[in-house]
Design a protein with these regions (language model features):
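N-terminal nucleotide/polyanion-binding subdomain common to many enzyme families
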Residues: 11-21
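Generic preference for hydrophobic
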Residues: 29, 43, 66, 86, ...
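Non-catalytic C-terminal accessory region of glycerolipid acyltransferases
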Residues: 2-4, 8, 99-216
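Short acidic-hydrophobic, aromatic-tinged amphipathic segments that line or gate anion-handling sites
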Residues: 29-30, 87-90, 171
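Catalytic core of membrane glycerolipid acyltransferases/transacylases, capturing the structured
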Residues: 9, 22, 36-93
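Short gly/ser/thr-rich secondary-structure transition/capping motifs
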Residues: 22-30
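A conditional alpha-helix N-cap/helix-loop micro-motif detector
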Residues: 25, 92-95, 127
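Short, basic, glycine/proline-bearing loop/turn elements
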Residues: 16-17, 83-90, 118-122
Length: 216
């Protein structure tokens, strides 16, 4: 039986690293009270940068075990991903070990972080196609799902970098497809809210304009 990944490293490092992150990037974070303080929850964000998980972490004091691609565990910062409780995911196939670790987090009432697109969005679309992993894990464990939208540019004292955390929704009684569709819809809404307030890059505004024309 898989063990829940440790979180003591997260608790130790997060206050210092998030302070540095906040001072350097000056991100705007909305919806700080929307991540439940206890109980099983899956935090899901669109994915544009390796530091996206920091933006959700700024909104809660509870540790979030993020699922991260296996390549990160072979590079210079492998120690960091292991120490902070990230779950190593082999994206080349069905990773049963990663799935078991994720289920262990949720079955113990923990917080799991997933990027449903599976990789950073490098397409011309507003967001990439969602995989079913996040919704499947949430439904299996009857966990709450929290949609998060990240827009803007990662640069020093950024005026556009913004994270907006949406209200959590229950997956109880939902099919995996229904949960996934709702998550996708909610994140698009949050992205559009960010852009409506001026938080975004020129490319994101262009994608949003193109998306609105397609959807009517």
């Amino acid at each position: 039986m898989a063990k829940k990944p440790r979180t003591w490293g997260y608790r130790l490092l997060a206050p210092v690293l998030l302070l540095i992150f906040r001072l350097y990037y000056s991100p705007k974070v909305f919806g700080k009270g929307n991540i439940p303080s206890k109980g099983a929850v899956v935090v899901c964000s669109n994915h544009k940068h390796v530091l996206d998980q920091c933006l959700a972490a700024l909104a809660t004091h509870r540790p979030i075990n993020y699922m991260a691609k296996s390549e990160y565990f072979k590079e210079s910062f492998a120690w960091f991903f292991k120490l902070t409780g990230c779950i190593c995911v082999n994206r080349n196939g069905h990773d049963e070990d990663a799935k078991a670790s994720a289920n262990a987090v949720l079955s113990s009432g923990g917080a799991l972080g997933i990027f449903p697109e599976g990789t950073r969005n490098k397409t011309d679309n507003l967001i990439g196609e969602f995989k079913y992993g996040a919704a499947s894990l949430a439904c299996k464990n009857e966990a709450m799902m929290v949609p998060v939208a990240v827009t803007g540019e990662y640069k020093f004292r950024s005026k556009t970098l913004c994270s907006r955390i949406g209200k959590p929704f229950s997956t109880k009684g939902l099919t995996v497809e229904e949960a996934n569709d709702r998550l996708h819809t909610e994140i698009i809404k949050l992205i559009n809210e960010n852009l409506a307030e001026g938080f975004g890059t020129p490319e994101e505004f262009e994608r949003a304009s193109r998306y609105s024309k397609i959807t009517g």
